[in-house]
Amino acid sequence: MAASELYTKFARVWIPDPEEVWKSAELLKDYKPGDKVLLLHLEEGKDLEYRLDPKTGELPHLRNPDILVGENDLTALSYLHEPAVLHNLRVRFIDSKLIYTYCGIVLVAINPYEQLPIYGEDIINAYSGQNMGDMDPHIFAVAEEAYKQMARDERNQSIIVSGESGAGKTVSAKYAMRYFATVSGSASEANVEEKVLASNPIMESIGNAKTTRNDNSSRFGKYIEIGFDKRYRIIGANMRTYLLEKSRVVFQAEEERNYHIFYQLCASAKLPEFKMLRLGNADSFHYTKQGGSPMIEGVDDAKEMAHTRQACTLLGISESYQMGIFRILAGILHLGNVGFASRDSDSCTIPPKHEPLTIFCDLMGVDYEEMCHWLCHRKLATATETYIKPISKLQATNARDALAKHIYAKLFNWIVDHVNQALHSAVKQHSFIGVLDIYGFETFEINSFEQFCINYANEKLQQQFNMHVFKLEQEEYMKEQIPWTLIDFYDNQPCINLIESKLGILDLLDEECKMPKGTDDTWAQKLYNTHLNKCALFEKPRMSNKAFIIKHFADKVEYQCEGFLEKNKDTVFEEQIKVLKSSKFKMLPELFQDDEKAISPTSATSSGRTPLTRVPVKPTKGRPGQTAKEHKKTVGHQFRNSLHLLMETLNATTPHYVRCIKPNDFKFPFTFDEKRAVQQLRACGVLETIRISAAGFPSRWTYQEFFSRYRVLMKQKDVLGDRKQTCKNVLEKLILDKDKYQFGKTKIFFRAGQVAYLEKLRADKLRAACIRIQKTIRGWLLRKRYLCMQRAAITVQRYVRGYQARCYAKFLRRTKAATTIQKYWRMYVVRRRYKIRRAATIVIQSYLRGYLTRNRYRKILREYKAVIIQKRVRGWLARTHYKRTMKAIVYLQCCFRRMMAKRELKKLKIEARSVERYKKLHIGMENKIMQLQRKVDEQNKDYKCLMEKLTNLEGVYNSETEKLRNDVERLQLSEEEAKVATGRVLSLQEEIAKLRKDLEQTRSEKKSIEERADKYKQETDQLVSNLKEENTLLKQEKETLNHRIVEQAKEMTETMERKLVEETKQLELDLNDERLRYQNLLNEFSRLEERYDDLKEEMTLMLNVPKPGHKRTDSTHSSNESEYTFSSEFAETEDIAPRTEEPIEKKVPLDMSLFLKLQKRVTELEQEKQLMQDELDRKEEQVFRSKAKEEERPQIRGAELEYESLKRQELESENKKLKNELNELRKALSEKSAPEVTAPGAPAYRVLMEQLTSVSEELDVRKEEVLILRSQLVSQKEAIQPKDDKNTMTDSTILLEDVQKMKDKGEIAQAYIGLKETNRLLESQLQSQKRSHENEAEALRGEIQSLKEENNRQQQLLAQNLQLPPEARIEASLQHEITRLTNENLYFEELYADDPKKYQSYRISLYKRMIDLMEQLEKQDKTVRKLKKQLKVFAKKIGELEVGQMENISPGQIIDEPIRPVNIPRKEKDFQGMLEYKREDEQKLVKNLILELKPRGVAVNLIPGLPAYILFMCVRHADYLNDDQKVRSLLTSTINSIKKVLKKRGDDFETVSFWLSNTCRFLHCLKQYSGEEGFMKHNTSRQNEHCLTNFDLAEYRQVLSDLAIQIYQQLVRVLENILQPMIVSGMLEHETIQGVSGVKPTGLRKRTSSIADEGTYTLDSILRQLNSFHSVMCQHGMDPELIKQVVKQMFYIVGAITLNNLLLRKDMCSWSKGMQIRYNVSQLEEWLRDKNLMNSGAKETLEPLIQAAQLLQVKKKTDDDAEAICSMCNALTTAQIVKVLNLYTPVNEFEERVSVSFIRTIQMRLRDRKDSPQLLMDAKHIFPVTFPFNPSSLALETIQIPASLGLGFIARV
């Protein structure tokens, strides 16, 4: 189409920019033909006038739509040009953190300078088996493509990794080799893949160095061939090296280092084994200090040295050789420190006893004088004579450096040879994959011979690359049958001819090297004369006559001629080499052997490979004087030959290209420098690939994809039934130029830009449709708005009018109401006035009447009171007369009472003082409060008595005073009468005065007594109040303490309960982890056994020697040769003679190291399995103990010994009782039976006596077992370990006998040494275990002795207590118990104070001992119950026998006829649930029931688990017969046969499910009928009678449990193999909801798949397969809990594989795909609901996938969205969330991408989340399986044996 159609307004273009290389801009107006200027708007907001080139008129490059940016394949872009490629790489690298991108057949890898979690084994598993175009670009995808093409096309492959130094070539090659090592595995036990990977650290240490561009730059090229056998497993490898940079050994530029190995040696100089090397710091050596940068940040040279030595050991380089290598390297360092002193201009000398040279000679084992001489002289040979010439100081220094380089190069080649020998395999190589790690195009300021060779190699590789790309394009066009047009591409053959043709640059250089006086200047002149102005690719610099310029495919490079000849000749003095060859150090002459030995045909072809597998690379030029032709080859000639061989190898293989890009020169992580990137893209051929693709038809669509995408551009009438014709018709209308597209068989091919044009048409059509939709919707919205407003206006009018009417009605109501209110109000006012007046009148009347009534009352009252007064006065006068009479009596009483009061007062004073003392002594004592209170009460009583006395005294005093007053008055009145008695008056006055004085004294005493009483009362009250307050405080404190104690107890209880719950959960988690580890070990053990069998089979096939009796057949059962034992315990029970393989071992030398490793590994696994089992038992016991701890704690300390003693006595009494019953039964039998029947010779008598005798013996045995209970506890532990050691020694002895039969003496010696070390190790282990067991036994003996003493003491105390009366007995027992507990607590406190750990261990041991004793006693109980059952059975048989004989024998027959056995027919109900078979029929039973049984017929026609029931019934019969050999043989054959069936038909789900179900049922039967109480409680009484009576098969239960675990793991593997091809297609690729997922909006160049589509799977396919699995398991009668576990594992596999592929496929991360995934998950959940499996935990395994689907669907813009995502995606790791957001790709241009800032926000919010950094889920993870006990209700006696099983030789019993 015309440019005017493309360059329209708003079109975006790319314009050149000096800083950013390319800058984006937008057109501000349409372009018209003839315009000289384009008006552009830049992204930074500026406007620009862009002038077009007036000569060419070329328009700027158009920019791809945003929807196309970030594509996985650069060739999928619509516009293919440099800015589009650069921008796409930048967006993927910076925004999406994606370092890999496809460019056609090339994988572009950008070095992130950061460790990324994308190379783990989970990533390898995700890419394994996938098509290259289905997954995101990755080095693993390229490796997988190469591996699949090798297997499919039977053609060797090559992976060519190139790029600048620091671009990541070595790392990419390393990851490719790791992928091959992981997915293929090795064909032997020697772990070849580990050796291949181990070669990397060795080669990096001797071939890598730090440069200014890279800290780990490879300074050599290498091509590694990884060999595979016919089964495509790694068998070996071979390495070729190219152009080692030898000059780095003697010179390093600023900020660079020498090879890593030198610094590693210096860092490890302090190791004892390196003392002899006399090394020091790297700065002390001339060859390591020139760069001034001896350290690399983040690298520990000492650790790297340890890794290097470890790798050397793994590759078989012995310790002596390693020390030899280090010795030579140290010698090179010391040689660099050798200094020269000038004598004159032409000669020099070395100082005498020069220390560096002395150390060098000592290390190299050469003569000091000789080496010193030839370092300063050289030998010249002419045609007639030879003479020695001294050399100058400069020449001597150059010779020294040349010698150092030569030694290092020889050592490098020697190490490469030994690495190749270690990687060599004796198995014939079928195919190989080569990995080429070679330097990319280089150009520096000064370019020399090394850059010339590197760029020459890149010219050859680029030519091969161009031819391959051209070939692939041609094949694609021919495949689609479209017209082939010649594509013009750059051909660099002229440049190659300039370099390597006759009279080319290399040819002239070799010719100049042959000239005696050839120089760099003369060589330059020859170049100018030959090629200047004759070859367009050769130029001469203007300002130099010692340089030349070559126009390479990438850029022009100017080479300096100085040094070309010297480097090409690589001259080393012959005399110096001779001195080294004469070294006493044996390893040094090996380095200088003739090159013929290094490339001998035998060494190249001995392994059956082509001679190209070992090619000598860049050997140095031979010394002067040698005549061999190959030693005269120059470095350039050798490099050209090796390069030709390399190109021949690459041309014979299918190449795969990896181009590594260095994003910046500063090693900043995820920093993209556009200038440097463009330079490398041009140099590595990526842009050439783009140009070739753009010249053809880069965009390719299938017809269905095109129709789905551009259906909007078609009219209804254009759509036909034939989609292909529809697409043709539409394209002819849309694109008029038919040259812009071509129709292939399955695809439409578009030229560059056509898809973008179609996208523009589609966008325009959609935009026009959007405008029309918007117009219609806007009109509809406005009309809808108008109608709404109209309805609103009418509604408002209606409501307003209604409101007005309501207001008027309200006015009328109010008017009427006001009139009514006024009427009633007026009436109310008048009525209230009337009521007030009436009330006032009533009040006045009431007050007046009251006044009159009160006056009348007063008058009556006065009269009444007058009468009373008169009565009172008269009474007073009478009393006064009486009082006067009593006066004298009262006075006497007063005197007496006063005297008594004084006495009482003194007494009270004394008591008061005693109270004060008591208070001082006992104040504050709470315990005396009650006594004080009582005394206070007594004092109060006394006080009251005193107060009453005082009151009486006052009364007497007052009465006396009154009497005296009356007397005085009377005397005064009768003074005259008293004159006669004057003397009497005086005496009376004196007496009055005396009485007054006494009265005053009494008053004062009364006052003091009252004061003291008040004071005492106050003090007493204060004391009481204080005591009450203190008592209150004490009570409060007591309540507080009680409350605190209760709270603390509650908190402690809660804490203990919470801790117990947490510990229980942790123990359960630990139990699951241990169970998982144990089951993984079982899986590893099975894998090793299978590998062992495979090795034996391969050895047999390799020998091609027929072996009688061991030839494998196609039947379901094979010979014993392919059997593998299950475990060490199981192996002990097998009665199989050891097999020898003398015919094989005598004819073939076996790999003894392989057998020793295998035997050692098997032994280790068996020991680890036993340890894991013990640990598992311990964990389960710990969980049990934690649950029962609270219940059993009160009983642990006190009742152990009593319980044991009483239980033993009870058992002994029970045994005695049983024995008595047996004797009574025997006596009764002898009395009741007829004499003839019970005669000693009668058969019945003999049968009965034998049975009774056996029962009696059994009882005696049980009694002895009870008596030796304690000894058993001690001996059980001692009997286990020696048994294991004995088995180990037996296995070692058998292996030694096998080894001694081999012929190879070297291997026998090696095996003997290994066995000696093994025996020494076992002996030391045995001695240590013996000592520990002896110590433990001694401790147990001491404990037993102490327990015996304690038991005796307890018995004595018990006997004493029994003699006491009941009350005293109880008191004595309590006292004894208190004493015992006190002593025990004191002992424990002392023990805890002295050693808490010992105290804790003592408690644990005590508890364990009690548990063990209880278990032993429980076992004895069970034994007694079994004996009772046997007695009952015998009694029943005896009764039946008596009755049967009495009924069937007549009296005459008793006398005359001999007794013969009578067969009594039994009814069906009398069957005992056992099956009888002969021992010789055991193999037939196993064959018919296991080996040749078809699960389908059994599952459909018979009861589930029938084989398990039959086998158990046979075991029951063998147990009934007490035949341990028969039980062992049957169980062993059963287990081995099941293994054989699963090994033969292990890929059949139905078979594996069938035998998993039957194995579990067999295991449940062994538990159900074991006789253990925990299993018997679910049985019926009849089933309990069927329990095993003679054997405890607990060990076989463990063996069967392990077998069931292995079968379960195999079932999971079968499930995974069946489901894996369906999951990605059904869950991700298939459109379950049609029309939701849009087609990719570009002509996505779907990379050609190496595997054709094998059919499309849908979600229905997965559901049908799940239904099939479920129905098969149900038909086989699998336990429901086990089915739930299988379903959970299936759903985990579905979720993990789906999520992993989602995280590795950018095209699947879209909104529509999230909806599809969510719908698919809902269908799976619906399936779970239909099957009633929602509680199986399967739904939870899909939670990560559900959250990933939700993450694709939610908004991803604001901070709130980020918060919602962080809270929602709790089942996804941070790496997974960020990966999904980075991969999120809109399906169309109307959807926005996730911004980088939003992703950063998510990362910031999730930075504190502690989760795994792993990106992918472990799809290989298997949940630990458990087999919950599921008893069967099926009665064994009712089971019928179908005739179809062919088991007629067994009989029901």
Curated annotation (Swiss-Prot):
Residues of the Myosin motor domain: 69-763
Pfam families: DIL (PF01843), IQ (PF00612), Myosin_head (PF00063)
GO molecular-function terms, A-Z: actin binding; ATP binding; ATP hydrolysis activity; calcium ion binding; calmodulin binding; cytoskeletal motor activity; disordered domain specific binding; identical protein binding
Biological process annotations from GO: actin filament-based movement; cellular response to insulin stimulus; chemical synaptic transmission; developmental pigmentation; endoplasmic reticulum localization; establishment of endoplasmic reticulum localization to postsynapse; exocytosis; hair follicle maturation
Effect of residue 1535 to E: Strongly reduces affinity for MLPH and SYTL4
Residue span, Dilute domain: 1532-1808
Domain of life: Eukaryota
Tissues and organs where the protein is expressed, per its UniProt entry: Detected in melanocytes.
Entry GO terms, CC: actomyosin; cytoplasm; cytosol; glutamatergic synapse; Golgi apparatus; insulin-responsive compartment; intermediate filament; melanosome
InterPro entries noted in UniProt: Dilute_dom, IQ_motif_EF-hand-BS, Kinesin_motor_dom_sf, Myo5a_CBD, Myosin_head_motor_dom-like, Myosin_N, MYSc_Myo5, P-loop_NTPase
Annotated binding of ATP, by residue: 163-170
PROSITE patterns: DILUTE (PS51126), IQ (PS50096), MYOSIN_MOTOR (PS51456), SH3_LIKE (PS51844)
Entry-annotated residues carrying N-acetylalanine: 2
Family, as annotated: Belongs to the TRAFAC class myosin-kinesin ATPase superfamily. Myosin family.
Protein name stated in the entry: Unconventional myosin-Va
Gene name per UniProt: Myo5a
